[in-house]
């Protein structure tokens, strides 16, 4: 695990963004961990979060021309990521959408740089994939191309089918998805931390029960995903 990924997990735990215990998910599952990126809610934590995203994006070597953050959570994210990338000498334009169209001033649903070229979507997590779908629609409508998605946490958890939400996005849109950390990173971290090791059995049991059973790389389109 890269140093910045371990540092991000420690940062998230320190901000109570990543917690361990018993939590009910929207799907009705009892999860042994909970991730709430909304608690990165001050200037210092948002600035650090943008730096972690920037490191993950650069480490993934994704080719892109600009950033897009879907409303609402993506708005502060895309701003902080653009600043962090620029601080490292990588200056990219960015854009985000409004939930409601504006009929005065500049008007429309989009704010920021015009959507053009290869667009990297940024969000906190991918659950149902709704914000990614809406983002892709905005990008295509502008004549631009989705280049990929960057998220904070990949839960690696399947929905109703055998694929995880991230794998579904990869298959549906044919674009890469990168994350600062994933569930495997969290498991590895717990194994190394004596003071948190008591949470490991529950997390491993949850992973075994709900993680995607598809073998990476996933064969999409003409191929058939293979169960592992």
UniProtKB/Swiss-Prot annotation:
Required co-factor(s) are: Mg(2+)
Record carries keyword Chloroplast: no
Binding of orotate: at which residues? 34-35, 127, 155
Q: Which residues form the signal peptide?
A: none
UniProt pathway:
Pyrimidine metabolism; UMP biosynthesis via de novo pathway; UMP from orotate: step 1/2
The cross-references to PROSITE patterns, in alphabetical order and at most eight, read: PUR_PYR_PR_TRANSFER
Please name the InterPro entries in this protein's record. OPRT (IPR023031), Or_phspho_trans_dom (IPR004467), PRibTrfase_dom (IPR000836), PRTase-like (IPR029057)
Pfam hit, one: Pribosyltran
Q: Function, please?
A: Catalyzes the transfer of a ribosyl phosphate group from 5-phosphoribose 1-diphosphate to orotate, leading to the formation of orotidine monophosphate (OMP).
Subunit comment = Homodimer.
The identity of this protein, by name, is: Orotate phosphoribosyltransferase
Organism from which the protein derives = Nitrosospira multiformis (strain ATCC 25196 / NCIMB 11849 / C 71)
